[in-house]
Amino acid sequence: MNATAPYLADEPNTIRTADNTRLFYRDWGQGTPLVFLSGWTLNSDMWAYQMEPLSRLDCRCIAYDRRGHGRSSDPGRGYDFDTLADDLESVLSALDLSGVTLVAHSIASGEAVRYLTRYGSARVARVAFIAPAATPYLLKTDDNPNGIDAALFEQGRLALSRSFPDWIEANAAPYFGPGVSRAPLDWAIRMMLQTSHQAMLELARVQTITDFRAELAKIEVPSLILHGDRDASAPLELTGRPTAALIPGASLHVYEGAGHGFYFTHAERLNQGLLAFLGRQPA
């Protein structure tokens, strides 16, 4: 099908991208626009504990399911950072948004950075990176000695391809950290299992091989990195701290005792941090 401009579709809560992929979105509240970008294999449901309270505080909270995730369509293509950045532009354009605060969790750190590289900051006022997991560069190379060996990534890929449900079960407990009941884990697992197998594998692959270091250095909008010091999915010293070091003027706030899913376990603190980033009140 020929590419067309992105538009709001007749279906409720639906945006059609330039390549006619259907994206489900939710749009709560009025005021300062925040666009929430979900983690790997998660969807817009993950942001409930940010969107609901912030939408009552003069914030317009928007989140969408990435292609191949949740209620969005699975086109069988486009599971790369360029296309995901294009999808984000489709959302911002269709909703005619400007002055946006991007809130990017985990792999979405790469989406946010690539968006700024491809489209600039005309629509974006600032970016909050929540437990970034795609930046700066995960793979160990001669000029990235602190990265992870390619052989370990290949082991992980094989485990994902053999049985994604078993991989999730083996890695679920550290995600939120100690003191969390089984119910939130089951909630996250249900989201993950709504992701297409192809999208899951392709995004896991591109996340590990994409080098964002040069792109991070070119970011000009105010940037905040929030990261837990017990993040087993994306360790602080591998991702969050070097991401902050590469973005000019970025701020890094470390959440003590927090894992990768602190949007749930530390929701109130995160919400206060986002409000402070907007200039609303001290965190």
Regions found by a protein language model. Give the residues of each.
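Flexible "cap/lid" loop of the alpha/beta hydrolase fold
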Residues: 113-159
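Conserved alpha/beta-hydrolase catalytic His-Asp/Glu region
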Residues: 138-148, 158-217
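Conserved HGGG/HGGXW glycine-rich cap/lid loop of the alpha/beta-hydrolase fold
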Residues: 17-77
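Gly/Ala-rich beta-loop-alpha elbow adjacent to hydrolase catalytic centers
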Residues: 104, 108, 112
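Catalytic active-site module of serine/aspartate enzymes centered on a nucleophile-bearing elbow/loop
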Residues: 249-283
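Alpha/beta-hydrolase fold catalytic core
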Residues: 1-35, 56-59, 97-98, 125, ...
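Conserved acidic catalytic loop of the alpha/beta-hydrolase fold
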Residues: 83-100
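Conserved loop-alpha-helix segment in the C-terminal half of the alpha/beta-hydrolase fold
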Residues: 218-258
